[in-house]
């Protein structure tokens, strides 16, 4: 894929750089191109760290890179600070009692209220946990303290890394932001930041989009804006651009407005009305806020003649220990026909306890897991054997969730959503996906706060050629309409200038 002029500018800009990348602008392609170029041009012993929010995103970066990344760190935010700061240097700050094996457990049962309780949990149980208050971040608070107090830690990071790349920065919380800026401003490690405050859908769990905005004005950063949406048609671009001050200037009227339909309808008629404007031969998605509304919506659309597949959240999606990736990989191995032992091996995190295991042994153990799916106890034993071999610990409640995921076929669709022409999913699960046609409900977005506005922006920018907004007569839906009119009015635009009301 060729680079656009602004993408080339970003790839060729040296030093600290922040990129504001609107939806559909080719952010990942640009970042991967930049990482590859700067690794190839590096003439020192130093390496890079590419830091993401999910193992899936890290794997996508690894898969796309055409250069050897064996020595480089490509992984999640938490794994970076745990493996590079906490595990090797905690003993420098807290003493030899903390020179021990550590594992993570962010489950509800392991949560604590205070920093001192979390420190004690490491000492007594070897567990890195999280706070009861999900807007506070113990892991990054601890890493920050260690980094500030351990000279060896600071020297190690400075000697090892020549650049750090941070993806989806709008989802960073305040503790993450403080640590990353310490790496940049104090340790002088060059930093590349990419994000978009318009897509911050995790404010409820502590995401702090203002942190991203604050870097935009820093004198030691060059800033670039990617606004060309290669996914959505011009009319949908207009609609999404009018939602935010910084993109309103990108609005330009279009002669045809049929790509966005506003349906004023009822709870009994919405499905049949919406399907009048859906092409059954093109992929589409119903995006709702709650799982219940998503499931019910799929049923109503299906009852009206177009089969919509509800994509549920799987039981294993709730698991937050370091073994979570393995449960997911085992499920994919058992559910997806073309997913092999080699695919599982490729997913072993770079920060894992051991990545150089014998392929034949892993294949044999996976076969044992597969052959035990009809016996829950044997399934637990076979899965635990594989986890132990790879250096990971299991919990019975998590093994139960995995067994439920692989034996209850209603969850299988969640592992191969691309197989289905028409799907119904929550918009939180739709981040990073795209569909020709999208149906959203006005009542899911009051547009009265930052979180609601971000959620709506993410949902509508999943659509490529058709957006259907279902407006029923409810308080939330009426708030949506009033607030949308106010947002559009800032550009002197009315709703009817942007879409067709039915």
What do the predicted segments below correspond to?
Residues 1-502:
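The feature marks helicase ATPase cores and/or their adjacent C-terminal helical subdomains
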